[in-house]
Regions:
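Glycine-rich acyl-CoA binding loop
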Residues: 1-11, 182-190
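A generic secondary-structure signal
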Residues: 6-10, 83, 131, 192-196
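Secondary-structure boundary elements
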Residues: 9-15, 147
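Active-site/acyl-donor-binding loops of N-acyltransferases
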Residues: 17-79, 134, 157-183, 187-258
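A conserved beta-strand-loop-helix scaffold within acyl/acetyltransferase catalytic domains
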Residues: 19, 23-25, 30, 41, ...
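Long, charge-rich alpha-helical interaction segments
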Residues: 55, 77-86, 111-115, 119
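Conserved N-terminal entry element of GNAT/NAT acetyltransferase domains
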Residues: 73-104
Length: 258
């Protein structure tokens, strides 16, 4: 009842888009009682293994720390990634610079590019500062500098695997860049992720993104599990979104996952 009341108050203003990513148990409540509509394309989860140690451990019961470290040292996928990182150089036309300041250049880029890509949330400096830099989690925000011009950003987060002690995942949380350079940017961002994985002893790179995103990252990642459904409240703004054509771009940064 409290949720229904809050949604009703926000909806009366008519200028708010209200959306959610319910689980299988709460989805019927959103649709039948809260006046939401299910969007055709939800959010998929994709994983790229950067080590095989976890696979080997499935065949061992209660391995010691020394055994785990030995497996890490001998891990063939880890060593292959290390060789790949040495042989693969970053393109000289592009730089990825970590920043703890999000300001006017992000706003200008957002104003220029948002008409080309449909997003659930804004990606201006106010949202990005609130979502990432003011968050207690240690998000890393990287500026994309292409031919000396600001050309977008991406955000990563390193987390311990909750189901496996001593294992770490690298999440690609958010990204937004010019669609005309999509293939090039995707290729170079993946190089950065692999280098981070190799240097930081990461076991998996994980991405969550909309199933129909125009900026979708598809290179050698394995889909896991079912997609998370997206629902939108059918107020005035929500109906405008529901009547628009796909595809939309949304990422883990648009959810309450963290």
């Amino acid at each position: 009842e409290a949720v229904m009341e809050s949604i009703h108050k926000i909806s009366e203003k008519n200028h708010h888009l209200i959306y959610g990513f319910p689980n299988q148990y709460s989805l019927p409540v959103y649709i039948k009682r809260l006046n939401f509509e299910l969007v055709k394309h939800g959010m998929k989860t994709q994983i790229k293994r950067t080590r095989l140690t976890g696979v080997f451990l499935n065949f061992l019961s209660n391995p010691s720390i020394k055994t785990i470290e030995l497996l890490r040292t001998l891990d063939p996928l880890k060593n292959l990634l290390k060789i790949e990182s040495i042989l693969t150089r970053q393109n000289k036309q592009i730089q990825f610079i970590r920043t703890k300041k999000i300001g006017d250049e992000f706003d200008e880029f957002w104003r220029n590019e948002r008409k080309n890509i449909k997003l659930l949330n804004v990606r201006d400096s106010k949202f990005l500062n609130w979502r990432y830099l003011l968050n207690k989690k240690d998000f890393e925000v990287y500026k994309i500098i292409h031919k000396k011009e600001f050309s977008g950003f991406f955000v990563i987060l390193e987390l311990n695997d909750p189901s496996r002690p001593n294992f770490k995942n690298l999440w690609l949380v958010d990204w937004f860049y010019s669609q005309k350079n999509k293939v090039f940017f995707e290729k170079e961002i993946l190089k950065v992720l692999k280098n981070h994985a190799q240097k930081r002893n990461i076991d998996n790179i994980i991405i969550q993104q909309s199933e129909s995103s125009p900026l979708g990252i598809k290179s050698n990642f394995k889909n896991v599990g079912k997609s998370r459904p997206l629902v939108i409240h059918k107020n005035e703004i929500g109906n405008k979104y529901l009547n628009q054509l796909y595809p939309w771009h949304f990422t883990l940064g648009d959810t309450d996952h963290f």
